[in-house]
């Protein structure tokens, strides 16, 4: 949520008129704020990476056109985050009739109760101020979502008080009417039952509410946003065609197309309890991208960005665990910590039916490919020949859960006048013992994958040697 400034002090309709306030339709409000930010050179979409040239321009055009929007994409593509960011285009504070059920504008009451109050109290009608964070409402669609949840129902308590069933004031409004003058976002839209989709259809197109056989016309001012899986959002899927037709913009999302964007998302979203060097984040990002390209993985389910994020958090936790057990002053993740991530992340991937029993083999192969690609990318031009020669002469370097960064560095063989280590550490920006040990492990693992050195793993310890 955004950091709020203090709300205005105006407290009555009369004061609001005197201040020159004008009521503005929701879509005009969003359009004006978006245009103002674009003209000022500001970024209306903070924290979104990889959509700058694809999704965001489409969203901006849809908002300028005043369209309801549905985002189509696989899981973990940032659809929900993008929907939430749209709320940042609302005015920070907006006036509402104090105590009004539907956050009505003081100049434009729409319910019978608010109209009566406005007529009776005139300029002395009390107002309050609503922050934009309160004007965004989100609902995860599930098959058991009811019309009462989204649209409303008759309130039996009000009927018991003596009001008739046809009295509009007997209605307990649902999520969409309560989002009047705001944004309602529905995730996984096709999961709604067909009768709920029909009810939404009336609200979006006709702006009327049908409850228990009678119709209440309300000039609702709501921007409807939704997300859906592309497979479900078709005439053959679980979406009714008339509702599909009501969304002015269907926008396809995607996973980050550039490696740098994938790393940036992970760095931004992961809650890391220890330092994770950039080269490890790159490995995890490449690992995720390899999974998305693998024929062994069910691509209909996708490989979420949350996979990379969870991997980074697990790697950091492994480093912190080692630092605590070995009484290290700093916790820095190394190549050895990737094994812990693979062990716990496999369950997040759905494999094709013919891959039963090969899941771990596939994960290990794709991770090694990611490491090799990262080594080629980051260490290109560094001559590791002296290190290979030292290992061929019998040197060994041990690492593992029980091995500290200092132990790894002490085990590195002396290379005479060769500046291999200095060049390696400088290339990766490694200054502390932990960062240097992580850099050394990356180089050793790269040499192993290139079949320049050997590697033996047993009992929680890995030894690089002949």
Protein language model regions, located:
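Dynamic helix-loop-helix/coil hinge segments at AAA+ ATPase domain boundaries and subdomain interfaces
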Residues: 17-25, 36-55
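Phosphate-binding P-loop
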Residues: 51-52, 60-66, 74-75, 176-179, ...
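Conserved C-terminal "switch" segment of AAA+ ATPases
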Residues: 5-10, 19-33, 233-238, 244-301, ...
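Canonical AAA+ ATPase core
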Residues: 90-128, 132-175, 180-273, 317-326
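Short hydrophobic/aromatic beta-strand immediately N-terminal to the Walker A/P-loop
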Residues: 69-72, 185
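Conserved glycine(s) of the Walker
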Residues: 78-79
């Amino acid at each position: 949520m955004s950091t709020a400034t203090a709300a205005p002090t105006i407290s009555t309709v009369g004061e609001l008129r005197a201040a020159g306030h004008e009521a503005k339709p929701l879509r005009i409000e969003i359009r004006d704020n978006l245009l103002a930010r674009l003209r000022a050179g500001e970024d209306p979409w903070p924290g979104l990476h990889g959509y700058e040239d694809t999704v965001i321009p489409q969203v901006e055009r849809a908002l300028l056109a005043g369209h309801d929007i549905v985002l189509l994409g696989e899981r973990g593509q940032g659809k929900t985050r993008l929907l939430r960011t749209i709320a940042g285009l609302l005015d920070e504070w907006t006036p509402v009739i104090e105590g009004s059920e539907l956050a009505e504008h003081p100049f434009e009451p729409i319910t019978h109760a608010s109209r009566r109050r406005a007529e009776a109290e005139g300029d002395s009608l009390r107002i309050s101020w609503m922050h934009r964070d309160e004007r965004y409402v989100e609902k995860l669609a599930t098959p058991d979502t009811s019309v009462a949840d989204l649209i409303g129902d008759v309130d039996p308590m009000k009927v018991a008080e003596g009001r008739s069933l046809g009295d509009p004031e007997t209605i307990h409004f649902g999520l969409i009417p309560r989002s009047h003058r705001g944004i309602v976002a529905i995730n996984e839209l096709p999961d709604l039952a067909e009768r709920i989709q029909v009810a939404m259809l009336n609200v979006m197109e006709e702006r009327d509410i049908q409850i228990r056989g009678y119709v209440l016309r309300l000039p609702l001012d709501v921007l409807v946003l939704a997300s859906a899986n592309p497979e479900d959002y078709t005439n053959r899927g679980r979406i009714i065609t008339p509702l599909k037709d009501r969304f002015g913009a269907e926008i396809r999302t995607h996973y980050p197309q550039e490696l740098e964007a994938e790393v940036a998302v992970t760095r931004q979203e992961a809650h890391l309890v220890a330092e994770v060097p950039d080269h490890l984040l790159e490995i995890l990002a490449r690992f995720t991208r390899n999974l998305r390209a693998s024929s062994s993985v069910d691509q209909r389910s996708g490989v979420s960005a949350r996979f990379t994020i969870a991997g980074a958090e697990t790697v950091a936790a492994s480093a912190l665990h080692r630092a605590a057990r070995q009484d290290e002053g700093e916790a820095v993740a190394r190549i050895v910590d990737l094994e812990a991530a693979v062990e716990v992340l496999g369950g997040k991937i759905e494999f094709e039916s013919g891959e039963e029993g090969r899941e771990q083999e596939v994960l290990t192969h794709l991770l090694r490919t990611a490491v090799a690609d990262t080594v080629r990318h980051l260490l290109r031009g560094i001559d590791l020949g002296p290190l290979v020669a030292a290992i061929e002469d019998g040197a060994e370097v041990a690492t593992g859960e029980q091995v500290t960064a200092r132990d790894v560095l002490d085990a590195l063989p002396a290379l005479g006048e060769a500046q291999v280590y200095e060049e390696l550490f400088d290339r990766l920006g490694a200054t502390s013992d932990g960062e240097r040990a992580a850099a050394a492990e990356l180089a050793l693992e790269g040499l192993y994958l290139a079949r320049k050195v050997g590697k033996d793993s047993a009992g929680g310890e890995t030894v690089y040697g002949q």
